[in-house]
Amino acid sequence: MTQTPTNPRERLIVALDVPDVAQASKLVATLDDSVLFYKIGYQLAYAGGLSMAQDLIGAGKKVFIDLKLHDIGNTVASGVASIAKLGATFLTVHAYPQTMKAAVEASRGTGLKILAVTVLTSYDEADLKEAGYSLGVADLVAQRARQAQAIGIDGLVCSAEEAANLRAIVGEGLSLVTPGIRPAGSAVGDQKRVMTPARAIAAGADYLVVGRPIVAATDPKSAANAIVAEIAVAH
């Protein structure tokens, strides 16, 4: 069974969605001890971000590598093994059975936790229909969540809109990691299924991934602290 961190600051994951290590390092220095957990995605990973991940881990931070792996089993397993050596806490894979099975098996005994991406938070019903899916967002997310749990995945990446339903489906056995978090008054951007921090926690999210509302803020540290404060009082 997974355990939700008792320290609200450990439940905030800041997405380092910047183009290079120099900007990311500057942001991390600005945020200082207000943030303990960072996410590194495609943009930064391919610009030196994986080396930076090692530095962050060495400095006592936690790192979530968001590469959404999806390939043949051997290739996924090799990628998982490489990421595990970095000392990362989380790694994402797409929620396809063969991909999840390979990732879970490769992560055994490493300390790396595998998160399955159910449906991207930038997708809505129309997007799924255009891509050829017959199921709607809620049904597809539920189907993939059940498959992920049966395979032994550690957690799910889902929008806050699906969190309550997923918690009912998977119980307390999986961590729910929720992107698309926007404090009241923030721009939605390219996300289509968004929610405030307090509402996301109330819906059952264990971790909140926040990018632009902190990264693009005039005062990133104050923005991060405000979200942590909101997490602390949410129920």
From Swiss-Prot:
<dbReference type="InterPro" id="IPR018089">
    <property type="entry name" value="OMPdecase_AS"/>
</dbReference>
<feature type="binding site">
    <location>
        <position position="121"/>
    </location>
    <ligand>
        <name>substrate</name>
    </ligand>
</feature>
<keyword id="KW-0665">Pyrimidine biosynthesis</keyword>
<dbReference type="Pfam" id="PF00215">
    <property type="entry name" value="OMPdecase"/>
</dbReference>
<comment type="pathway">
    <text>Pyrimidine metabolism; UMP biosynthesis via de novo pathway; UMP from orotate: step 2/2.</text>
</comment>
<keyword id="KW-0456">Lyase</keyword>
<dbReference type="InterPro" id="IPR011060">
    <property type="entry name" value="RibuloseP-bd_barrel"/>
</dbReference>
<feature type="binding site">
    <location>
        <position position="191"/>
    </location>
    <ligand>
        <name>substrate</name>
    </ligand>
</feature>
<feature type="binding site">
    <location>
        <position position="212"/>
    </location>
    <ligand>
        <name>substrate</name>
    </ligand>
</feature>
<dbReference type="GO" id="GO:0044205">
    <property type="term" value="P:'de novo' UMP biosynthetic process"/>
</dbReference>
<comment type="similarity">
    <text>Belongs to the OMP decarboxylase family. Type 1 subfamily.</text>
</comment>
<keyword id="KW-0210">Decarboxylase</keyword>
<feature type="binding site">
    <location>
        <position position="17"/>
    </location>
    <ligand>
        <name>substrate</name>
    </ligand>
</feature>
<feature type="binding site">
    <location>
        <position position="39"/>
    </location>
    <ligand>
        <name>substrate</name>
    </ligand>
</feature>
<feature type="binding site">
    <location>
        <begin position="66"/>
        <end position="75"/>
    </location>
    <ligand>
        <name>substrate</name>
    </ligand>
</feature>
<feature type="active site" description="Proton donor">
    <location>
        <position position="68"/>
    </location>
</feature>
<dbReference type="GO" id="GO:0006207">
    <property type="term" value="P:'de novo' pyrimidine nucleobase biosynthetic process"/>
</dbReference>
<dbReference type="InterPro" id="IPR014732">
    <property type="entry name" value="OMPdecase"/>
</dbReference>
<dbReference type="GO" id="GO:0005829">
    <property type="term" value="C:cytosol"/>
</dbReference>
<dbReference type="GO" id="GO:0004590">
    <property type="term" value="F:orotidine-5'-phosphate decarboxylase activity"/>
</dbReference>
<comment type="subunit">
    <text>Homodimer.</text>
</comment>
<feature type="binding site">
    <location>
        <position position="182"/>
    </location>
    <ligand>
        <name>substrate</name>
    </ligand>
</feature>
<feature type="binding site">
    <location>
        <position position="211"/>
    </location>
    <ligand>
        <name>substrate</name>
    </ligand>
</feature>
<comment type="function">
    <text>Catalyzes the decarboxylation of orotidine 5'-monophosphate (OMP) to uridine 5'-monophosphate (UMP).</text>
</comment>
<dbReference type="InterPro" id="IPR013785">
    <property type="entry name" value="Aldolase_TIM"/>
</dbReference>
<dbReference type="InterPro" id="IPR001754">
    <property type="entry name" value="OMPdeCOase_dom"/>
</dbReference>
<dbReference type="InterPro" id="IPR047596">
    <property type="entry name" value="OMPdecase_bac"/>
</dbReference>
<protein>
    <recommendedName>
        <fullName>Orotidine 5'-phosphate decarboxylase</fullName>
        <ecNumber>4.1.1.23</ecNumber>
    </recommendedName>
</protein>
